[in-house]
Amino acid sequence: MDPTPQSHPILAYVLSRLPSLLPVSPSLSTPRARDIEQPSPRAPSGAAEFDLVSRMPGLRHPSVLSAMTRAVADVSSARDALRLLGPRPDHELVDSARAFLRSHAAEEAEEEEEDEKVAKSREVVRLDEAHESYGGLLREAEERLDRVYRTAMRGRDMQVVAAAHGGGGEEEAGVVDDEVVRVLRDAEEGKAVERLLLADRQLRHLPEQLGRIRGLLVLDVSRNQLKNVPDAIGGLEHLEELRLASNALVSLPDSIGLLTSLKILDVSGNKLRSLPDSISKCRSLVELDVSYNVLSYLPTGIGQEMARLEKLWVHLNKLRSLPSSVCEMRSLRLLDAHFNQLRGLPAGIGRLAALESLNLSSNFSDMRDLPASFGDLLGLRELDLSNNQIHALPDCFGRLQRLERLRLDQNPLAVPPKEVVAGGVGAVKEYMARRWRDARAEEERRGSAVAESPRVSTPKEWLVRSVSSLGSWVSDVTRYGAGQDKAAAEEEEDAYLQQNL
């Protein structure tokens, strides 16, 4: 919840110098359960602070600090309010709450139990929205402090600037590249334009008119200074390749979901905090690279419609979990999720039957085990699990007989033992295959023992058999009695006839 030196360096520095703005929360002083979506706050980094002061020496000036204090007073009050409300709910819980509210509105349920669930769902959504607003407030405060500092360094009246909360600022006008102008002109004249390569042009702005180039197949604006992508990009209905790597993007427009012909999307090396839910509508995607960003989650339904996706790079982010819909990417051959904060994999990961390369390295103390379905990844050839906290590989690991490359170093492994790991991938495969066979044999032995053991009847079965036996006995008695009556009747009839004669 608190700003960190990595995400908001100036704001974290100012708050660390103001004890009155940092009330101690009881919840932070007591142990709490490990939470995938809400990790424990980390202590400020001294190295990061030293680097910040080296770049901005004026931060030590009392007048600068005083001006900055007034500029961020709203952050303190907002944070206190959020601490009372509680931690932010995880993304999948919020999506579930929103979906329930939509269905409830459509069905107009009136049961008391449903009303209680509606209230809880609304609380989840409101809490998430409050945290989202707080995140925006932190970003605005960081920019505000930067303007206060720059103004102070120019010798202006800092009290006026702080009171205005950073109003004004120098906006940099977007300058359209000559090449873009030429291409737009050609498109207006009816000329076919299929490729637009604008990498390394120091572009800060893309014009809305770009969305009118209907025949465009490839757009490369990598390694520029773009902070946003125009909504009009959704008009490029035939676009197959979009490269936005190494810019300053903090978000992508929802209209990106209209690019249904898109096969390659590269947004690596930006400042993306989230991806739009609409990205799952890019059904033709074959390669998706969202690495080197600050993503803390992926859209809940990202895998539901990406049946053709073959390569997914999500490394060097802050992901704490992968949504279960990732398991629906049945064509996925490569998944790279190293250097995140993953605490596990979805239970259905084994459904990725086409997966050949999987990198889960360097999730450090967060990654501790593998799910039982991991042994279903029979096509896996390359696996990197190094730099984690895995103590034992599951017995089903012995099924991965196609493995050619395996890294397990920097794990506190007990199964397999270190000497086996030192023998390489072949030794590990042989050891785990033997454990798998032994586990299967033991399971079959137990199954046979259960099948051969005398079966204890349940009270219901005993009663059914008793009633059946009683019914048979009554039937026999009835037949016997009927026979006796018939014989007596015949004897009486014979005696009567003889008397008459």
From Swiss-Prot:
Gene Ontology biological-process entries: intracellular signal transduction
Q: In which tissues is it expressed?
A: Preferentially expressed in panicles.
**UniProt keywords, alphabetically:** Coiled coil, Leucine-rich repeat, Repeat
Give the highest taxon in the source lineage. Answer: Eukaryota
SUPFAM superfamilies, per database record:
L domain-like
Q: Where is this motif: GVYW?
A: 424-436
**A Pfam family for this UniProt protein?**
LRR_8
- Ranges for the region named Disordered are 25-47, 482-501
State the LRR repeat positions: 190-213, 214-236, 237-259, 260-282, 284-305, 306-329, 331-352, 353-376, 377-402, 404-423
Database matches in InterPro entries: Leu-rich_rpt, Leu-rich_rpt_typical-subtyp, LRR_dom_sf, LRR_domain-containing, LRR_R13L4/SHOC2-like
Q: Which parts form a coiled-coil structure per UniProt? A: 104-147
Instruction: Please state which protein family the record places this protein in.
Output: Belongs to the SHOC2 family.
Full protein name: Plant intracellular Ras-group-related LRR protein 2
Q: What is this protein's gene name?
A: IRL2
